[in-house]
C-alpha cells in the first residue's frame, strides 16, 4: 500500500491524503476583506469624509460651521442579529444605523460658538455575513480593481497605428487634474515634449516649467545633462529652442489662457494662483495615501539605478569634518546597494539638494500661512553611468533626480514634478523602467468601505451646497447646525448607490459556494473602471502578478471574460488596497513555518518562489536538489539555498470554486473555468451527500459559510431540536442558536439547517452546530456520487446528452425543493379601496376552493396555475355599464357590480404547496408605502424531480442535458448486477481534454469498494500510478474498465467500458423554468405582434424567415391570410368574422398594421407612401376626364 495520511475534515469525516505538501496554513475567514473594509469605513472613513467637507463658510464669510473631529458615531443594534434580520426580510425593510455627529457654529465677528448634535440619516449596515439587507433583499457590494493613483511611464500607440509611437507619462490623482507629458518617438524629425492638463490644449514642457517659475538656465541645468553617446539630449534641446515666450510671466499667462479659454479677465492674483489651485491645493488635488505611496516608490532611486554604475563618490555628512566615503565612483549598483543609497538619503545621511527658482513663485499664495513649504522642496540627485561601456568611454554622467523620500503630502509638490520630468528624460537614456498597466503592481482594490466613503462624500458635497443656500436665507442669529443640515442628500445618495449602482448586486445565493464566490468577486468595470465594449485582450489576459492573488481560472465566459475576476483562496488586501499573497520564508534551504509573510506584487520583484509540493524533511529542510522556482515573469532551476520563499499551499493560485475541483491539473483551463462556474449553479438537493473524491476545501467552506451556525462561546449542548440549539457555557449562561427552516434564497432555492450535534456534546469556539443546505457532516456537498459508464446508448447521448436511470427519479436522488413568493398590495385611491374578500365576482367555486373565510389561501393547500391565492376586488371607477350589465340588472333588479376581480393567482406554468402566508398591515403598526393599507405575501414550495431537459454537470466542465429517463431494467449493468445510473458519451472527453473526470471516475470506484474517502487537492493530487495501486488494493481492474451487459439482449458489450463513481450536480437550468406555451396572450400595441419570452406570456410570431419559406413554396393565398387576417389586420379580421357569420362574400384584406408602422416612419421623414392601386385608380379617373 502506498504511504498516505488520514486527515480529518469536518467533525467526523476522515479521508486518505496522498498529497506532497508537508504543512499548510489554515485558511482564514473568506469574508475578511469585505468585513475589514466596512469596519474601516465606520472607524475612519466617515470621520475622514466629514473632515474633507467641513468647515462650511457662509457666502458672506460671517458664519463658519465646523465638524468636531472624531465625534461621528453610527448607532445600530448588534445584539440578536438573527431576529433583527428575520424581521427586516419579512417586512421588506433595510438593516441600517443612524449616523450622528457634532457640529459647531462660530460667528466670526463675536467669536460666539454653539455646538449641537445633528443627524445625517440612515446608513445601511453590513451583516455578519458580509451582505447588506436592502428592502428585505440581501445585496453585496463587489470590490473594484482599478489603476492606482500615481505616475505611469511607457510607450503608447496613438491612432491605432503601430508606427505612430509616443513616449508618454501620466500623473493620475484620486481627485483633480490628470497631467500627461508626451513626445513622438517615431519619424525622422525630433519632436518637442508637450504637457496636457486634463483635456486642454497641449503646451510645451518648457512653457509649463517656466509657468511654475523655473528659468531656462535651471531647466537646462536640471535636465540638460541627460546625455546620449552623442553628448547631448536632443529632445530637451529641441523643446528649449522652440520655446517662444521670453519671460516666465508670459508663459504663465499663456498657460492660463489655455486652461481658462474664453475667460479674458486675467488678473495678477488669478495667474499666480493658477497652478497652486490646480496641482498644489489639497482640497482640489488629492493623490490619496495610496497615490503618495506609489509616487514615492516610483520616483525613488531603487528601481531606477539597479544595474548602473556610480559616476561620483558618495560621502556621509558631506561638507563637514566627519565626511566619510560610503560608495566609490564606478561601483556597480545592485538592489542591496540601491536600497542603502535610498535609505541614506531618506535618513539625511546623504544631503538633499534644494531646487532654485521654484518655490517662491509656485507657493506664493501659501507661503504666508505655511512658510515651511519652501524648505520642503528638496530632491535627491545622483550621477550615474547607464552601463559599463558608457563608464569606460568616460561620457557625461546622467543625473537621476528623485523626489524627497520623506514626502507625505497628499497633493503634488514641486519636488515630485522635477523628479517626474527627470524620470521621463532618464527613460530616453534607458535608465528606469516602463510601467506595465496590466500588472497588479499598478492596480489596487477599492473595497466596500472606500466605495461607501466616496458616496458619503458626494452626499456631503450636496449637503454643503444646500447648507450654504440655507445660511444665505437666514439671519445670523437664527442659523444653527441643526436647521441648516439636511440629511436627505446623504440618505438619497446611499439609497441610489445600493439600488442602482453596477457594483451593488442582488446576491447570488443558489448554493453556499455561489454566495462566498459572489462576496469575493472583483470587477474591473463600474465607475472609474473599464468598459466591456472597449476593453482589449491585454487587459483581460492572465498576468504573472495574478499568482496567489487573482484566480486565473474563474471568470465568466461571455463579454465580461477577464474583467470580472475572483480573489485567490489565501489572498488578502493591505491598507493601500494592493492584493497580497502569503508565503513561508526560506532561509538557506530551511522553511520557516512560524508564520506566513504576505507580499504584494511589487515586493515580489527579483525574489525566487518555490512551489509547495517540493520534498521537505521533518525539520523543514528542502531535500529536492534542483528546484523549479518562479522569478518575475520567468521560471528558473536553482538549488534550495537560493530559494527566498515557498508557497503555503497548492490551492494558493486558484479561487475557492476552482480549488474545489479534484485533479484540476489534469483538466484543460477552459473546462476548469466551466467547472468553476457550474459548481456555483448547483441546486441544493433534498438529501445532501459529500463527494467520495474531494479536495479538502469543502470543510473550509462549511466552516466559513454564513449558512451554517458556528459556536461563539465554548460549552455543552443543553438542548437540541429542529428549531433551536442551546449551548450552556462554563459560567452557566445559555446561548440560543436559531435554525432556519424552509426559508428561501434570493434565487428561490431551499435554505434549511439540520443539527449535527447531540445533547451533552462538548463544543468549542468555531465548531459547527448545523449542516445547512448543500452541506453534509461539515463538508460542502453540492451533488451526488452516482455510478457512471462512458458508453453510447442507442444514440440518446449524442452531442453531450445524458442518459439517466429511472432510479434517480424514484429514489429522489436529484430531487430539489424550490420556494417562490407571490405578493399582492391593497391600496387606497380616489376611486375607493381594494378589499380582501372571498366574494369575488364571476369566479367559480373551484378556483376559490383553497381560500379561507377572509379570502387568503390556507397553508398546506396544493395549488396549480390560475388558482386564486388572495381574493381582492378593486373599484371599477367611473366606468359606464355595458348594455348586457344593464339588462341583467333590470332582470334581477340588482345594481351592476362596481367591483372588478384583481385577485392574486398562481402564475402561468407554476404549481406547488402553500408553505407560508404573511400579512402586513398599517393597522398592525407595520410601516408601509403611502396609500398601501395591506400587503399579503404567499410562499409556494415546489418539489422538482429530475426530468428530461434538466441540465447536469460534473466538476470538470463536463455538462449535458438529460435526453431520456430510461427504466432501470433497460439500463446496462455490471456482471455482479450493479445497474448503471448515468451513461455519458465517451466522445466528450478527448477533444475537451478534461481527463480529471476519468481519474475521478476510477478513484471514486475504488473509494466505494474500499468504503473510504479520498482528498486530492489541485496541483497536488494523486498521480496516475498511485490510482492504479489503489485500484489494485481494491481488487479492481487496473485500467478501470468493466464488462457491461445489455439487459435487452442479455449479451455482453463487445468492449470493456470505463465504469466508476463520479460526483454529479443538478444545475439551476431546469426545464420547468424554461418550457413555455400559450394559446392566447398579450400583443404589442404598435405592431400587433405577440410579445416574446416566458416572463411576458409571449408567443411565436410569423417572422421574416417564415414568410420566405411560404414564398419559396408559392403559397400566395396562405401567405396573404397569415400576413393580414391572421396577423395584425384588426379591421379586416372583424369584417371576415361578419362575412362568415352572415354568409356574405369575404372582403378583400386591408393593410397589415406592421406595414402601417413602416409608412408612418416614412411620413416622419417627409416621404408619402401610396399603394399601386391608388395610382391605378387615379389613372382611370384621369382617362375618363380626358375623354369627357
UniProtKB/Swiss-Prot annotation:
What is the catalytic activity of this protein? Answer: RNA(n) + a ribonucleoside 5'-triphosphate = RNA(n+1) + diphosphate
Q: Carries keyword Secreted?
A: no
Enzyme category, top tier? transferase
PROSITE patterns membership: RNA_POL_BETA (PS01166)
- In the UniProt record, which is one GO cellular component term? DNA-directed RNA polymerase complex
Ordered alphabetically, the record's keywords are: DNA-directed RNA polymerase, Nucleotidyltransferase, Transcription, Transferase
Please cite one Gene Ontology biological process associated with this protein: DNA-templated transcription
EC number of the protein: 2.7.7.6
Carries keyword NAD? no
Q: Which GO MF terms does the UniProt record name?
A: DNA binding; DNA-directed RNA polymerase activity; ribonucleoside binding
> Which NCBIfam families does the record cross-reference, listed alphabetically?
PRK00405.1
Assembly notes: The RNAP catalytic core consists of 2 alpha, 1 beta, 1 beta' and 1 omega subunit. When a sigma factor is associated with the core the holoenzyme is formed, which can initiate transcription.
Family the entry assigns: Belongs to the RNA polymerase beta chain family.
Its annotated function is as follows:
DNA-dependent RNA polymerase catalyzes the transcription of DNA into RNA using the four ribonucleoside triphosphates as substrates.
The name on file for this protein is DNA-directed RNA polymerase subunit beta
Q: Which organism is it from?
A: Mycoplasma mobile (strain ATCC 43663 / 163K / NCTC 11711)
Phylogenetic classification of the source organism: Bacteria, Bacillati, Mycoplasmatota, Mycoplasmoidales, Metamycoplasmataceae
Amino acid at each position: 500500500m502506498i504511504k498516505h495520511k488520514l486527515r480529518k475534515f469536518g467533525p467526523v469525516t476522515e479521508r486518505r491524503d496522498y498529497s506532497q505538501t508537508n504543512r499548510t496554513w489554515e485558511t482564514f475567514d473568506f469574508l475578511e476583506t469585505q468585513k475589514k473594509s466596512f469596519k474601516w469605513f465606520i472607524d475612519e472613513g466617515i470621520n475622514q469624509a466629514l473632515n474633507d467637507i467641513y468647515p462650511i463658510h457662509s457666502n458672506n464669510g460671517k458664519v463658519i460651521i465646523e465638524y468636531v473631529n472624531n465625534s461621528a458615531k453610527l448607532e445600530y443594534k448588534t445584539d440578536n442579529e438573527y431576529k433583527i434580520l428575520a424581521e427586516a426580510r419579512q417586512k421588506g425593510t433595510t438593516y441600517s444605523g443612524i449616523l450622528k455627529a457634532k457640529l459647531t457654529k462660530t460667528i466670526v465677528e463675536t467669536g460666539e460658538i454653539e455646538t449641537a448634535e445633528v443627524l445625517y440619516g440612515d446608513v445601511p449596515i453590513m451583516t455578519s455575513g458580509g451582505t447588506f439587507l436592502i428592502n428585505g433583499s440581501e445585496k453585496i457590494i463587489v470590490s473594484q480593481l482599478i489603476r492606482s493613483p500615481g505616475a505611469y511611464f511607457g510607450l503608447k500607440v496613438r491612432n491605432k497605428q503601430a508606427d505612430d509611437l509616443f513616449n508618454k507619462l501620466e500623473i493620475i490623482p484620486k481627485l483633480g487634474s490628470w497631467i500627461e507629458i508626451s513626445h513622438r518617438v517615431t519619424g525622422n524629425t525630433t519632436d518637442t515634449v508637450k504637457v496636457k492638463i486634463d483635456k486642454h490644449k497641449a503646451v510645451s514642457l518648457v512653457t509649463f516649467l517656466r509657468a511654475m517659475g523655473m528659468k531656462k538656465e535651471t531647466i537646462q541645468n536640471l535636465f540638460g545633462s541627460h546625455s546620449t553617446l552623442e553628448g547631448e539630449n536632443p529632445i530637451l534641446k529641441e523643446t528649449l529652442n522652440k520655446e517662444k515666450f521670453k519671460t516666465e510671466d508670459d508663459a504663465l499667462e499663456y498657460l492660463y489662457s489655455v486652461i481658462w479659454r474664453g475667460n479674458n479677465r486675467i488678473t495678477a492674483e488669478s495667474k499666480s494662483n493658477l497652478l497652486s489651485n490646480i496641482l498644489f491645493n489639497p482640497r482640489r488635488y488629492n493623490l490619496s495615501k495610496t497615490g503618495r505611496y506609489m509616487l514615492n516608490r516610483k520616483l525613488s532611486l531603487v528601481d531606477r539605478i539597479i544595474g548602473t554604475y556610480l559616476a561620483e563618490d558618495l560621502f556621509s555628512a558631506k561638507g563637514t569634518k566627519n565626511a566619510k566615503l560610503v560608495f566609490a565612483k564606478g561601483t556597480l549598483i545592485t538592489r542591496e546597494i540601491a536600497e542603502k543609497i535610498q535609505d541614506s538619503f531618506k535618513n539625511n545621511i546623504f544631503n538633499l539638494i534644494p531646487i532654485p527658482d521654484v518655490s517662491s513663485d509656485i507657493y506664493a499664495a501659501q507661503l504666508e500661512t505655511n512658510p515651511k513649504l519652501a524648505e520642503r522642496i528638496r530632491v535627491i540627485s545622483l550621477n550615474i553611468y547607464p552601463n559599463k561601456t558608457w563608464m569606460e568611454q568616460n561620457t557625461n554622467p546622467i543625473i537621476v533626480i528623485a523626489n524627497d523620500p520623506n514626502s507625505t503630502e497628499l497633493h503634488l509638490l514641486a519636488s515630485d514634478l522635477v523628479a517626474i520630468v527627470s524620470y521621463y528624460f532618464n527613460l530616453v537614456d534607458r535608465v528606469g523602467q516602463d510601467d506595465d498597466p496590466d500588472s497588479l503592481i499598478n492596480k489596487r482594490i477599492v473595497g466596500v468601505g472606500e466605495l461607501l466613503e466616496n458616496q458619503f462624500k458626494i452626499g456631503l458635497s450636496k449637503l454643503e451646497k444646500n447648507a450654504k443656500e440655507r445660511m444665505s436665507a437666514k439671519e445670523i442669529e437664527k442659523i444653527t447646525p441643526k436647521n441648516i443640515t439636511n440629511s436627505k442628500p446623504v440618505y438619497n445618495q446611499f439609497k441610489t448607490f445600493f439600488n442602482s449602482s453596477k457594483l451593488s448586486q442582488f446576491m447570488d445565493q443558489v448554493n453556499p459556494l455561489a454566495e462566498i464566490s459572489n462576496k469575493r468577486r472583483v470587477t474591473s468595470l463600474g465607475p472609474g473602471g473599464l468598459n466591456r465594449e472597449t476593453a482589449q485582450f491585454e487587459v483581460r489576459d492572465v498576468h504573472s502578478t495574478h499568482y496567489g492573488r487573482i484566480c486565473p481560472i474563474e471568470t465568466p465566459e461571455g463579454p465580461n471574460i477577464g474583467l470580472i475576476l475572483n480573489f485567490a483562496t489565501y489572498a488578502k488586501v493591505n491598507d493601500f488596497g494592493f492584493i497580497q499573497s502569503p508565503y513561508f520564508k526560506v532561509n538557506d534551504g530551511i522553511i520557516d513555518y512560524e508564520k506566513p509573510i504576505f507580499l504584494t506584487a511589487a515586493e515580489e520583484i527579483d525574489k525566487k518562489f518555490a512551489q509547495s509540493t517540493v520534498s521537505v524533511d521533518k525539520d523543514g529542510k528542502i531535500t529536492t536538489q534542483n528546484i523549479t522556482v518562479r522569478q518575475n515573469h520567468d521560471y528558473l532551476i536553482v538549488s534550495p539555498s537560493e530559494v527566498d520563499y515557498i508557497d503555503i499551499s497548492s490551492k494558493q493560485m486558484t479561487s475557492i470554486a476552482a480549488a474545489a475541483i479534484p485533479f484540476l491539473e489534469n483538466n484543460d483551463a477552459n473546462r476548469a473555468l466551466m467547472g468553476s462556474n457550474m459548481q456555483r449553479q448547483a441546486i441544493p438537493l433534498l438529501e445532501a451527500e459529500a463527494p467520495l473524491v474531494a479536495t479538502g476545501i469543502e470543510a473550509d467552506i462549511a466552516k466559513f459559510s454564513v449558512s451554517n451556525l458556528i459556536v461563539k462561546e465554548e460549552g455543552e449542548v443543553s438542548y437540541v431540536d429542529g428549531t433551536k440549539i442551546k449551548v450552556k457555557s462554563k459560567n452557566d449562561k445559555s446561548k440560543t442558536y436559531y435554525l432556519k427552516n424552509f426559508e428561501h434564497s434570493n434565487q428561490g432555492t431551499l435554505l434549511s439547517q439540520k443539527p449535527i450535534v447531540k445533547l451533552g456534546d462538548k463544543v468549542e469556539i468555531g465548531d459547527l452546530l448545523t449542516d445547512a443546505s448543500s452541506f453534509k457532516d461539515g463538508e460542502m456537498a453540492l451533488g451526488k456520487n452516482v455510478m457512471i459508464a462512458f458508453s453510447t446508448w442507442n444514440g440518446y447521448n449524442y452531442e453531450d446528452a445524458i442518459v439517466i436511470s429511472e432510479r434517480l427519479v424514484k429514489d429522489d436522488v436529484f430531487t430539489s425543493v424550490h420556494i417562490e413568493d407571490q405578493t399582492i398590495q391593497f391600496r387606497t385611491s380616489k376611486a375607493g379601496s381594494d378589499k380582501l374578500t372571498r366574494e369575488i365576482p364571476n369566479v367559480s367555486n373551484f378556483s376559490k376552493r383553497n381560500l379561507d373565510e377572509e379570502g387568503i389561501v390556507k397553508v398546506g393547500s396544493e395549488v396549480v396555475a390560475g388558482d386564486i391565492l388572495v381574493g381582492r376586488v378593486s373599484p371599477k371607477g367611473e366606468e359606464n355599464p355595458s348594455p348586457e350589465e344593464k339588462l341583467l340588472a333590470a332582470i334581477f333588479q340588482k345594481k351592476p357590480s362596481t367591483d372588478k376581480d384583481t385577485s392574486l393567482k398562481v402564475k402561468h406554468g407554476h404549481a406547488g404547496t402553500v408553505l407560508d402566508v404573511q400579512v402586513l398591515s398599517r393597522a398592525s403598526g407595520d410601516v408601509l408605502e403611502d396609500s398601501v393599507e395591506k400587503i399579503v405575501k404567499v410562499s409556494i414550495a415546489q418539489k422538482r424531480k429530475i426530468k428530461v431537459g434538466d441540465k447536469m454537470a460534473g466538476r470538470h466542465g463536463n455538462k449535458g442535458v438529460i435526453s431520456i429517463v430510461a427504466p432501470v431494467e433497460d439500463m446496462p449493468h455490471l456482471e455482479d448486477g450493479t445497474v448503471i445510473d448515468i451513461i455519458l458519451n465517451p466522445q466528450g472527453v478527448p477533444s475537451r481534454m478534461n481527463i480529471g473526470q476519468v481519474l475521478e471516475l476510477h478513484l471514486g470506484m475504488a473509494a466505494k469498494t474500499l468504503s473510504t474517502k479520498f482528498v486530492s487537492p489541485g496541483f497536488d493530487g494523486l498521480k496516475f500510478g498511485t490510482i492504479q495501486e489503489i485500484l489494485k488494493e481494491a481488487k479492481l481492474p487496473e485500467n478501470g474498465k468493466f464488462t457491461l451487459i445489455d439487459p435487452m439482449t442479455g449479451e455482453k458489450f463487445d468492449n470493456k467500458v470505463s465504469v466508476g463513481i463520479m460526483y454529479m450536480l443538478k444545475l439551476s437550468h431546469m426545464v420547468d423554468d424554461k418550457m413555455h406555451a400559450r394559446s392566447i396572450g398579450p400583443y404589442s400595441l404598435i405592431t400587433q405582434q405577440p410579445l416574446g419570452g416566458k416572463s411576458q406570456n409571449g408567443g411565436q410570431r410569423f417572422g421574416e424567415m417564415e414568410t420566405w419559406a411560404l414564398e419559396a413554396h408559392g403559397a400566395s393565398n396562405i401567405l396573404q391570410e397569415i400576413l393580414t387576417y391572421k396577423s395584425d389586420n384588426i379591421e379586416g379580421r372583424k369584417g371576415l368574422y361578419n362575412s362568415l357569420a352572415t354568409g356574405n362574400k369575404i372582403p378583400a384584406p386591408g393593410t397589415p398594421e406592421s406595414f402601417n408602422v413602416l409608412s408612418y416612419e416614412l411620413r416622419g421623414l417627409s416621404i408619402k407612401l401610396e399603394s399601386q392601386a391608388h395610382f391605378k385608380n387615379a389613372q382611370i379617373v384621369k382617362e375618363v376626364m380626358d375623354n369627357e
